[in-house]
Amino acid sequence: MVAQERQEVAELIHQSTNSWYLANGKDAIFKGPPSEALLFCQVYEDLDPGCCLVAKCRISGRVAGSCFYHPRKTHVSLGIMNVSPDFFGQGIARSLLTKIIQIANDQSLPVRLVSSAQNLDSFSLYTRQGFSPIQAFQDMYLEVPEEGFHNEISGGFEIRKAQLSDVEEMVVLEKRISGIERAKDFKYFIENKRGIWNTLVCRGTNGTLLGFLGSVDH
């Protein structure tokens, strides 16, 4: 993806994601204009410049599909993949995925992804390409009242905003739990140059890092 294609890729993300949700009896996930999805291009290019593949129609020149990927020390992470509904069934997603697998193989790294079990089309694609599920996560939806939550925090923990000095311990904790390292991601969230991230850490009374949580407000 080059800079001139970012807006078109954002429109593709917006259109194809909403199309899938609507086709499966759900509400559109993006409620605003296509420009909302430009955040994906901005953030992913901040983190990994030049790591987005696009498939373009040779006849019309339209962007038919896109996929971001994120090379890390321990793995290559597969980012958001989208194919225009106008180009479904033409093997575009498979071609993009095959290319990224080759990029990872060239670096002798495994490919890691987090995929919704609700999307059987993508689950089938990944399975055919050799992926195997190793861990399940549960989506959680919380309705936050206008006045917010006012839960008391146990005095047995210290919860505060993350600092760059926390990154080393965050990396160690995640590697122990998941076997991966993402130091540059944690630094990016904490530095928060776009002003949209909030990263918290939780420490025990002895100072041990017990957990951390990142969120985005956009």
Model-inferred region functions:
Residues 4, 8, 73, 120-121, ...:
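Short alpha-helical
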Residues 9, 128-218:
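Amide-forming acyltransferase catalytic core, primarily the GNAT-like/NAT-type
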Residues 10-59, 63, 176-199, 204:
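Active-site rim helix/loop that mediates acceptor-substrate recognition in acyltransferases
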Residues 52-54, 61-70, 77-82, 201, ...:
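Conserved beta-strand in the GNAT
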Residues 71, 84-86, 90, 118:
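Active-site acidic-Proline motif in GNAT/NAT acetyltransferases
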Residues 76-79, 104-118:
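Conserved GNAT acetyl-CoA-binding A-motif
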Residues 80-83, 89-104, 123-128:
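Conserved acetyl-CoA-binding loop-helix of GNAT-fold acetyltransferases
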